[in-house]
Amino acid sequence: MTQAVEYKGLGRRKSSVARVIIRPGKGEFHINKRPAREYLTSDLYLKDANQPFVLTETFQKFDTFVNVKGGGLNGQAGAIRLGIARALLHASPDYRTKLKAEGMLTRDARIKERKKPGLRAARRARQFSKR
């Protein structure tokens, strides 16, 4: 029994985590067992998620299967983008220069700041009145 070649990548963004599997194929793209266009309703999110394929000119060469949890659609699209970029590196290390130059391999570390005690939000304080 021969097992199909597959490359895996993990991407995180804000509170979203995406597990990406790419296999040589004809360009299928599924997110949580649904077509990507159906899951990521906005073209902006879909374009963001597909960016590593566009940069490396490999969109029609791989079938992509993504399992993503947490956060909103923007964070999920960013997590998928990082996961795809990392999976492409496993497929071919030659893509590193293109992906690195565009910042695709850098995890965006910006996350929501925690609420502090005595304040209404992370930095928002109650309104102050001198008199």
From Swiss-Prot:
Transmembrane segments: none annotated. It comes from the Bacteria. InterPro entries: Ribosomal_Su5_D2-typ_SF, Ribosomal_uS9, Ribosomal_uS9_bac/plastid, Ribosomal_uS9_CS, Ribsml_uS5_D2-typ_fold_subgr. One of its GO terms (cellular component) is cytosolic small ribosomal subunit. Gene3D superfamilies: 3.30.230.10. Keywords: Ribonucleoprotein, Ribosomal protein. The keyword Ribosomal protein applies. GO terms for biological process: translation. One of its GO terms (molecular function) is structural constituent of ribosome. HAMAP family: Ribosomal_uS9_B. Belongs to the universal ribosomal protein uS9 family. This is Small ribosomal subunit protein uS9. The gene is rpsI.
